Amino acid sequence: GNFIGMLPQSMQDSKIYGVEIDKISAGIAQQLYQKTSIAAQPFEEANIPDSFFDAVIGNVPFGDIRVNDRRYNKHNFLIHDYFFAKSLDKLRPGGIMALITSKGTMDKESPAVRKYIAQRADLLGAIRLPNNTFKGNAGTEVVSDILILQKRDRLIDLEPDWVHLNTDENGVKMNAYFVDHPEMVLGEWKTVSGRFGEEDTVVPYENADITELLEEAISNIHAEITDYEVDEELTEEDNSIPADPEVRNFSYTVVDEKIYYREN
């Protein structure tokens, strides 16, 4: 609901669809934002067509667990990596994806997932947040990244620098993107004692306004937004919406006072 509630004025007329695994949270969001369509189900069960959305925004779950989805099982993705892969498939070519994830996505030793993403999307920019960013909202102290990607129109086999890790001038090993763009790290690197011994983390700058730092970092990210190209031979407007899992296949339903027919 936070993403919907903070939508800029220029996007107020957008058609918004959400997926929320917690039924209570989904119900609250649906009541607060009644013009949206919120599916109360796990993301892996969401029946959403490919190349459907202009933008995908979310806060992906973290954890060392895997999701059972036959389409993606061969990749052996951890849950946060799975969210990136499926979200990219649901995004139209040229569409923008902005996801909050743990620093593990960018900093893990294996480059496999980053290469998978790079083949399908261009990294427009990444912002590393200090470890207290979500402490007040979620009660967690974890270094998080905002990754902003633009989907490619075709698969490309390449490995940009951000697929790999590098070491900064202080000997801290991290994603090469943040070594090359230290201004996108909104805090100071410190070595602290963690659950598994010493670990590198990002602590907030003293007396710094995270909102101002974030706005400045975002101003460094640029993209050319392309309009979706509609086939001129199509004679009817595509008014399809993601299928409601509670509506039986090949049956009619009413959404926002309009009649729809569910087909797959």
Give a label for each model feature.
Residues 1-58, 63-65, 77, 94, ...:
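Conserved S-adenosyl-L-methionine
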Residues 222-264:
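Charged, often flexible domain-edge or linker segments that flank or initiate folded functional domains
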Residues 70-75:
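Short glycine-enriched, charge-decorated loop/helix-capping segments at active-site entrances
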Residues 61, 131, 152:
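Flexible loop residues that form catalytic
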Residues 64-65, 106, 156:
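Short glycine-rich, flexible loops that bind phosphorylated cofactors or substrates
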Residues 19-23, 28, 76-135, 142-149:
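Conserved Class I SAM-dependent methyltransferase catalytic core
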Residues 136-235:
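Flexible, glycine-/basic-rich loop-and-beta segments that form/coincide
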Residues 45-48, 132-136:
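A short acidic, often aromatic-flanked loop/helix-cap motif at beta-alpha or helix-coil junctions
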